[in-house]
Amino acid sequence: MSLVPKAGYPFIIYFLDNINKYISDKTIQTYLTAFQINVDNLKVINKQFIPEAYRIIKLFTTNTTIMFAIYNYIFHGISKIGFLEKFSEEQIKYITDLETTDTKLIACAGSGKTRSVIGRIKFMVEHGLADKDEIYAITFSKHAATDFHRRIRELFPDYENFCQLKNFSTIDSMAKSILCRVKHHRSENVEILSIALRNFLKEATDEEINSITKFKIIKHLFIDEAQDLNNIQFDIALMFKKHFGTTIHLCGDPNQNIYQFRRSSNSYLMEFPAKKFELTLNFRSTQEIIDFSECLKPIATTRSVSGTNKIGPKVTIMTKQAIQIHKLILYFLKQYEKKNDLSNIAIICPTRGTGVNANTGLAMIFNFLKSNHIKVNQLYCESSSDERKRLVDRIPGHINLLTYHGTKGLEFDTVFVMDFYHSLLNIEPTYEEHNINQYLLYVATSRAISKMFICTYINNYGGYLNHWITKVDPKYYLIDSQPKIHKLTFRNEEIFDSNGVTELLEKLSEEDLYSIYELIKVNTFYEKRIFPDHTDIDRGKDEALYGIFCEELFYLCYYLNKKLEPRRFELIEKIVKSKFIIVENDLECNILKKFINTNNLTWTQFDQNKNNFRKDVIKLVEKYFSRNVELNDSIICTNDFINIVEANKIDIRDTYNRYLQPDKYQYNYNNIIFDLFYLVVVQYAYDINHYIYIK
């Protein structure tokens, strides 16, 4: 039995003397290759052998952790890099970096970015580059943080050896954990917490900074989805670096910056001065889908290719009338479910369609699926917070319906991308909306694994292929007809008051912010002036169902308290009296609702402004409306709405009659609250085109 050399120089000499014995070992090869040692140059004695041997000596002497790792593997059979077999060469290069400087990982869609970050943390801890208690990772939503935890557990069952799950959280959770210790702030509001932490760190004394280090040492901070950073969050990261010497690790895809409405910017990721790594292999999609989505990238990053060499059909673009597209989708679904689970399919729609109805496009698809008895897993809600509230669990036998924003981080075998660029309400985008649309399209078209269909509605009034899709090389897709290419024009930017919530919060002093915290904790309703009145801030045209219900409940309580009859529901009364204008399709319905209902248009107003209306609007009005009935005195709807309403008309009528007789429920809102909610649902279902809710 040969003697075991001591670790250090004796081992280095031993290793080089016995290089032929160990060079064929897979684990040894993985170690050496990860640190840019050319294993082939060590297999035979030649002129490349000596330079390569010197590189090994330098590696072992400057990175003793690596030397000890190989030593323990050879003599004790302990390997700390077996997990690298799960990763690609690009990922291994990032994971095994021996420098502990600032880094940024630029990763394409489907490249395994989060897995690589987890692998990097494991390698750093197990090779002595960092302590597990000093590594933190933050993301921007509870869903993302939960998903991070899930992936750690699935990837490495021994995760407790290299990470503290409590250190991997949302940015607001981290802010709260610091502020509640040093300032006793306990707000749940993300924006307030972020601004408060940023302000605190900017003004913190040495004593306050030292008090933080007593319970939280942040040596390494990984920021996932860093393309979604805003100025406040980036300032926090820089403050950590300034006060605690924190090493910053940004990870993200600059082409997936889809939360610009939250003031996020990919410039923080792109321009951050750090050691750069790239992941260009896409392990999700076929090369055909990758080629298509690559053409939609807003930022010219390194071109990505398939990491699996999977091939499949080209992307198919369908440009037909809505009813034809719906029939094709239905046929595909019926054929698909014969051998596969529908939960592997997603239909992706723009978050806000194009126009005043928040989810016009979603509603059209939702109603179509429901009317054809297709089970739907609705991965979105009608409020503006759909990213936070969306559910991500798939339901067997249910097709997934979600927004462009809601697709982030998800993947499906087959994807239908609904392209409503101009077809729903024919409203031109602003220049900013047009550019954001490119980011959204890239995200939506990079979700598919095997098959992808782009669906564009055409009609007599519009229906053009999305401008960005026309930039895709035709060799990357099949199309059923020559697409209509519209002339690219933009509507004027809407000018808003700068008094947005975030802007207002940023202006507040530390004392005013604390006052807000105290107000939020109060459970009773009262009024207190802590800042100049800004109640004129536009809340937007969207109202969540709960918000509408609360408003109606407020009015009901007010009238009942004064022993008055409740205020009436104009829409419900029209339903009861069957005042319907039935149009052929959702497109016509949406156009007429916008120009008549939204503006409460009368025949007199129509005649006075006729020259200012679009020709397609005039044609529709003349096609469906009679001068015997006032324009704004009817419900504009499709047969889908009629079919559902007629089946429930008696219930709606009886519910409304009960509601209008407060003496019979003793002017007590508790006795009528369920009826009130049902009436609100009917009204809401019509407003958002989700008629199925009426059931």
Curated annotation (Swiss-Prot):
Q: Read off the Gene3D superfamilies from this record.
A: P-loop containing nucleotide triphosphate hydrolases
Q: Which GO terms describe its biological process?
A: recombinational repair
- Enzyme nomenclature, EC number: 5.6.2.4
Write down the PANTHER family for this protein, in alphabetical order. ATP-DEPENDENT DNA HELICASE SRS2 (PTHR11070:SF2), UVRD / RECB / PCRA DNA HELICASE FAMILY MEMBER (PTHR11070)
Organism source for this protein? Acanthamoeba polyphaga mimivirus
Q: Which family does it belong to?
A: Belongs to the helicase family. UvrD subfamily.
- By what name is this protein known? Putative ATP-dependent DNA helicase R568
> Residue span of the signal peptide, if any?
none
Supply one GO molecular-function term: ATP binding
Q: What job does the chain carry out?
A: ATP-dependent DNA helicase.
Q: Which residues form the UvrD-like helicase ATP-binding domain?
A: 86-499
Q: Which reaction does it catalyse?
A: Couples ATP hydrolysis with the unwinding of duplex DNA by translocating in the 3'-5' direction; ATP + H2O = ADP + phosphate + H(+)
Answer whether the UniProt record assigns the keyword Hydrolase to this protein: yes
- Which is a Pfam family this sequence falls into? UvrD_C
Q: Which UniProt keywords apply?
A: ATP-binding, Helicase, Hydrolase, Isomerase, Nucleotide-binding
Q: Where is the organism placed in the taxonomic lineage, from the top?
A: Viruses, Varidnaviria, Bamfordvirae, Nucleocytoviricota, Megaviricetes
Binding of ATP, residues: 107-114
